[in-house]
Amino acid sequence: MANETYKIAICDDSQADAEYIATLVKEWAKDRIVKIRTYPSAEAFMFNYAEEKDFDILLLDIEMGKMDGVTMAKAIRQDNESVQIVFITGYSEYIADGYDVAALHYLIKPVKTEQLLNVLDRAAERLKKNEKELLLKTADETVVMPVREIRYLDVQQNYVTVHGKTDVKVVKR
């Protein structure tokens, strides 16, 4: 568990709710490397998402501002099928909308700690199950690197340097 890394976005127009959810995520993250970002609106998230699309888990409120969480999730699903989407809202009438975006789960506020921790465990399991990996042969070892961990590649002559979230590996071409 200690080498698991996740990038999680919390999108909620209620700052108190976003902070509460972030606290629960931090509890879940005790044995993991987790980067948490919070956004006050779907628009704020989408503005950032244009530059930073590597989120693993999205915890989304549904009713917020001009763009709702379901519309935002539909836009994200157009180019990211693997991100795990969890709706967290006070409105049960939107449950059916979650199926349109293949949401992992739908939690009703106020969220119970155990519920969210279980859903995050399920999201992590799904991410691992669907994960694509590269087999990299370095000078002294062969390692497996999950594709989602790769940030960029650097090529110089006969060597490729693979820059990951937490690791750098040099591979001969």
What are the functions of these language-model segments?
Residues M1-A9:
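Non-catalytic signal-transmission and effector/linker regions of two-component phosphorelay proteins
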Residues A2-N3, Q15-R37, Q78:
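Two-component/phosphorelay signaling modules centered on CheY-like receiver
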Residues C11-D12, Y39, L58:
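Conserved sequence signature across two-component system core domains
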Residues I36-A44:
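Conserved Asp/Asn-Gly motif in the active-site loop of CheY-like receiver
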Residues P40, I108, K172-R173:
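Short loop/edge segments at beta-strand edges and connector loops
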Residues A44-K129:
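CheY-like receiver
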Residues N118-R173:
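Conserved binding/recognition cores within well-folded domains
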